[in-house]
C-alpha cells in the first residue's frame, strides 16, 4: 500500500527527487508513515482504520506533536496526505 501511496503523491505533483538528485517528498512521506507504524507498534491496516486518532496524536495539540512537527512537520503532513490517499482509494474521488 505504501507503494501506491507514493504513486498517488507523484500523481498529485509531489517530486520523487530534488534538484540535486536526492529523494524528495514522494519518497519521504511513505517513509514517515512506516516510521510511525514502527513507533506505534501497529500495522498499516490499523493506522488506516484509526487515521483520525493518529492525526490528532501527532497534530499540534497531540501528545506526539514533538515528533509530528519534526523535519518541517513531515510526520504530520505524511499522515494528512495518507488520509487523503485512503479517501481516494475508498471513494475514488480525485479531489480528496
What residues fall within each predicted segment?
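Non-catalytic DNA-binding core/recognition domains of DNA-processing enzymes
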Residues: 18-92
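Short terminal alpha-helical segments
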Residues: 1-23
Amino acid at each position: 500500500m505504501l507503494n501506491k501511496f507514493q504513486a498517488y503523491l507523484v500523481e498529485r505533483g509531489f517530486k520523487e527527487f530534488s534538484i540535486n538528485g536526492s529523494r524528495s517528498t514522494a519518497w519521504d512521506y511513505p517513509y514517515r508513515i512506516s516510521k510511525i507504524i514502527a513507533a506505534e507498534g501497529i500495522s498499516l491496516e490499523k493506522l488506516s482504520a484509526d487515521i483520525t486518532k493518529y492525526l490528532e496524536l501527532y497534530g499540534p495539540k497531540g501528545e506526539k506533536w514533538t515528533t509530528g512537527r519534526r523535519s518541517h512537520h513531515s510526520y504530520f503532513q505524511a499522515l494528512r496526505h495518507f488520509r487523503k490517499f485512503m479517501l481516494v482509494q475508498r471513494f475514488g474521488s480525485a479531489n480528496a
